[in-house]
Amino acid sequence: MYAIVVGCGTTGIKIAEWLMASGAEITLIEKITEKQRFADNLLGSVVVLGDGTTIDTQNTAGTKRADLFIATLSSDEDNMLACQIAKHYFEVNRTIAISANPDNANLLRLLGIDIVVDVTDLITEKIQSLVAPMLVEDL
């Protein structure tokens, strides 16, 4: 499997590490030089320096042959644009976007992004699962 991950923040790097450990070939895209260098040193020269929301950068990264495209940027709008380019211009089969704003999650799904990870929902569900046993104990 060939996967592209946009964004070399903590989330992007963790996903890339997991994909590599699982045997996937990966390329990351990062537009901030310092983050690109850090990720290259950590993961082994697999990062394209550029803007993941542009056709040119995605072309350089080999998006046309990607099986999976994951956008982990801090902006829902940038994640949406990156996934739209991957899905509709490069015809990537599977796209995943992180959504920091729950109001945008449904819109991202409506726009054809295959999997939308709603960070707010995940955090809320995790806290609820941890706190629920405490509430039962108090009864």
PLM-predicted stretches and their roles:
Residues M1-L139:
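Cytosolic regulatory regions of ion transport systems
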